[in-house]
Amino acid sequence: MSEFKRWLIERFKIERKRFDRSGVYAYTQRAMAYNSNKIEGSTLTPEQTASLFDNGTLPVNDDYYRAKDVEEMNGHFLMFNYMLDTLEEKLTENLIKQMHYELKSGVFEDRANGYAIGDYKKRPNMIGMYKTALPKDVETEMKQLLDWYHKQEKSMKILAEFHARYESIHPFQDGNGRTGRMILFRECLINPDLKPFIILDVNREKYIDGLKEYRENQKTEKLVSLMNQEIEDYYTQCKYFMND
């Protein structure tokens, strides 16, 4: 593991324990929660996201927000902490399901709609016009995906393929992109040859295009290119905190 990643994981744990909202842990929590939720249509701003993480409240002058956006933002903070708590565990179906539970257990709308929380989907769903795995096939396809992944020498290409296949299966009723991107961050933290990154909302179109390229042509070039771009951005942001 690189010196940078050892430093990063250590700072995450120390700053979380101290409730430090001024370091790289808080930056990563806010940046990842904001961007990953924004990609999925969240209306919350970076300022609102920071206020929720720092204080558990929205700015006093805010007169509009969607309850679901707030609930999912808080759920994302919890999912990130669960990810940190399980870094030494193997990536399994149960671990992924628990990530989904942390993200979605407090979302009223999903519960009211009867969505499975912390479990695979019970109803078919689509990505635009693309048909994803049927509910009856999800468990088999997820097992095959994880079995394949654990046999591979880890690289950005393998990680991109894993992510694209995961999103094509779309194992949950909702929250697939956010759990998938959290898995990306996790696997980059724990694998020696990978570097962590956050997919930014400003690059949403490139990201969607990369997933589409894999679905249609089984190619990962666009996703890998984007991931390498985001690696540089995240490292640049983290360097600011390395001088304390």
Where do the language-model regions lie?
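FIC/Doc superfamily catalytic core
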Residues: 1-244
